[in-house]
Each structure stands twice: as structure tokens, then as C-alpha cells.
Amino acid sequence: MTAAAPLILVVDDFLDNRQMYAEYLAFSGLRVEEAENGHEALEKAFAMLPDLIVMDLSLPGIDGWEATRRLKADARTKRIPVIALTGHALAGHSKGAMDAGCDAFITKPCLPERLLEEVRRTLATFQHEH
């Protein structure tokens, strides 16, 4: 019996982006769940304990920054790696994302291949460390 494929939670309020990333990751053999805002991301993360979260930082309501801080502050989810996705390419945003607890940072627009590469790299790093 083989281990289940890693579960990835893709969080983006823009439906087209979310579906594109989710479909590409699923096509690549990963299990994928989707959330459209920070509140839903927190609910699903606590319920499902995904192996990795792809988090858009610009979300309505609870934004990706705050959702990541809450995930990293909770014992149940603090070890789940978070890849930040943002349309802001400023250097300060990547530092801010890391300060919030993100483990990697990708600027949008982001090709699905680039996201998959970062997901695989981050999963490998965390599986090796934990």
C-alpha cells in the first residue's frame, strides 16, 4: 500500500487563479482542497491539516497575512508550510510574508509549473526537516 499523495490547500479569492492552480496540482498527482478567503482557509486547515498551504496574501476579510499568523500561532497547524502568493513584487512584501510565518514566497502572475516546482521543493524540505 502506498502513502496518500500530499494534501495541498489552495487559497485565492480569484476563482480563475484558484481553479488553475488546483487543477494543475491535482493533475500532477497531489490531492487538492480549495478555499476562497482567509476565514475558509482557517476552517479547512484546522479540519483537514493539509501538508502544505498555498496562500494568496490579498484576501477579503481575514487576509492571507493574518490567516498565516493564526495558523503559525496554533499548535495544530504551526508546522504546516505556507507558500505566499502575491501580486506585489516589492522586496518588503517577501520579508513581511516571512515575518508573518510564510515559508516561501511567489509573485503573481505565476505559471502553474512554477507553483508546482515550489510546492515540491517546500514539501521535500519540510519532510526532510520533520
What residues fall within each predicted segment?
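Charged docking surfaces used in two-component/phosphorelay signaling
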Residues: Q19-F27
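Short hydrophobic/Thr-rich beta-strand motif most characteristic of the beta2 strand and flanking loop
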Residues: G29-E36, K44
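Active-site beta3 strand of CheY-like receiver
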Residues: M48-V54, L59
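The feature encodes the CheY-like receiver
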Residues: P60, K78, L90, P109
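C-terminal output helix
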Residues: C110-V119
